[in-house]
From Swiss-Prot:
This is Ubiquitin-conjugating enzyme E2 6. It comes from Saccharomyces cerevisiae (strain ATCC 204508 / S288c). It comes from the Eukaryota. The active site is at C87 (glycyl thioester intermediate). Residues 1-232 are cytoplasmic. Keywords: ATP-binding, Endoplasmic reticulum, Membrane, Nucleotide-binding, Phosphoprotein, Transferase, Transmembrane, Transmembrane helix, Ubl conjugation pathway. Its main location: endoplasmic reticulum. GO terms for molecular function: ATP binding; ubiquitin conjugating enzyme activity; ubiquitin-protein transferase activity. The modification Phosphothreonine is found at T178. Changing C87S: Loss of activity. Residues 209-229 are annotated as: Disordered. Belongs to the ubiquitin-conjugating enzyme family.
Length: 250
């Protein structure tokens, strides 16, 4: 249970953070326990954490601000072990270096600075930039669908996340459709249904198609397979391909 002084100090700090939130940082106390704070760090643009959404906790002692909090990061991030106490100069690992004048904002700014550095410490891990970028992209989905505490503390952020994920899905779908529209004629032709040789009107194109069919049958025989009963049919991909080639050759 928080002392009167700790409660007063943390209430004041929360008010200050609401009025003047530090860049990339959102933090608030648990409504049922002012000693338990939750934060979200948004990955800065010039780092492998760009666009990432990193949730963690600050667990303050009852006699704060005279002793430092325990610091943890819950969202997988590639920099720290998830849900593990971190050894930082402003954490409970180093009460001897703690300054009572430091605040929640000071602590989280220090955590962000350490996160974007390469310095090792207890609770840190080493991963590639590619892994960090992958985790950054997956972080919103993780917090929204797998992180129970995140959903309880930041319900409005969860709603924003759902909208972000839906938009991302639509954008990716549009990109895939655009790719189909710009597909070259030969590739598109190869995906179409079959037609008969009789439907190929141009004599030269029909000859080419017949040659392709015979070659296909010969290959089947070499592989020990019987020609299919529908061997009089060829893929429209071949037909159109040959037709287009014929146009260029004429």
């Amino acid at each position: 249970m928080a002392t009167k002084q700790a409660h007063k100090r943390l209430t004041k700090e929360y008010k200050l953070m609401v009025e003047n939130p530090p860049p990339y940082i959102l933090a608030r106390p648990n409504e049922d326990n002012i000693l338990e704070w939750h934060y979200i760090i948004t990955g800065p643009a010039d780092t492998p954490y760009k666009g990432g959404q990193y949730h963690g906790t600050l667990t303050f002692p009852s006699d704060y601000p005279y002793k430092p909090p325990a610091i943890r990061m819950i969202t997988p991030n590639g920099r720290f072990k998830p849900n593990t106490r971190l050894c930082l100069s402003m954490s409970d690992y180093h009460p001897d270096t703690w300054n009572p004048g430091w605040s929640v904002s000071t602590i989280l700014n220090g955590l962000l600075s350490f996160m974007t550095s390469d310095e090792a410490t207890t609770g840190s891990i080493t991963t590639s930039d590619h892994q960090k970028k992958t985790l950054a992209r997956n972080s919103i989905s993780y917090n929204t669908f797998q992180n129970v505490r995140f959903k309880l503390i930041f319900p409005e952020v969860v709603q924003e996340n759902v909208e972000t994920l839906e938009k991302r899905k639509l954008d990716e779908g549009d990109a895939a459709n655009t790719g189909d529209e710009t597909e070259d004629p030969f590739t598109k032709a190869a995906k179409e249904k079959v037609i008969s040789l009789e439907e190929i009107l141009d004599p030269e194109d029909r000859i080419r198609a017949e040659q392709a069919l015979r070659q296909s049958e010969n290959n089947s025989k070499k592989d020990g397979k019987e020609p299919n009963d529908s061997s009089s049919m060829v893929y429209i991909g071949i037909a159109i391909f040959l037709f287009l080639v014929g146009l260029f050759m004429k």
